[in-house]
């Protein structure tokens, strides 16, 4: 049966669990995890050992096929899968801004799913939903750090970097359909300028029922192996002149020159699989000092924070008799 635990006992078990997690990287492959495209050539041997036999250069340029078929919803990765702007993404990526706004008590798309049998039936996403297509990425470290030195105080350094970033972004954003971002890599070691096209008319094409599409994360039944239809389809539209426009009835599908081709062959056990996308972050290249801080202070501070939350909950949930 299930073990009955108090919040404090649960906290103690979580401590042990966190310690166990800290030891896992020692057991994992040294080349697992997330890598930037330009790093692929340095992994040529490892990729071949893993079963990738094509030219590594073909997955090293984010602006050539197949890399340039990968797009972002701003909070999720996605990919063009047709020349008419059809995009595949995860089910949980369309729940809030595509399914929810188009659902009602009488027409619950979470319960029954949705399929547009023609482009005319595709459903408008919530206002502000966009697809982001990366057009350019370049190193701007020297420009961002201009005016700083090793002696610059932290606050002053932050202000200089912030002002330099704003100036670079203003110069980069030449139209309403272009958005530019300054990204920091390796804890400020390098900076890159990303120039992206914003597609502002996005519509829901297909989503399975929630009981099919939800990927997990629930309290019960969160274990492997499991089978989940965690995917959905949306389509990007533009104005008749081909430029990015907000939703309008006469908008036309975006022409995607690069798109992934879906194989009907499926996969076999031990087939090579690579996931391309826009992950939030990785800590695989933290410095020794950063790891040392985590071990000496960071993790303990987090445990202390969790314990304070447990104490607060217990204080406000005890019965009058203290139980």
What is the predicted function of each stretch?
Residues 1-2:
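Short, positively charged low-complexity motifs
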Residues 5-7, 30:
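Compositionally biased regions
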Residues 8-11, 24, 318-323:
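Short, intrinsically disordered, charge-balanced linker/junction segments flanking boundaries
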Residues 11-17:
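Positively charged n-region of N-terminal signal peptides that target proteins for export
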Residues 17-26:
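Sec-dependent N-terminal signal peptides
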Residues 28-323:
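Terminal presequence/propeptide segments associated with secretion/organelle targeting
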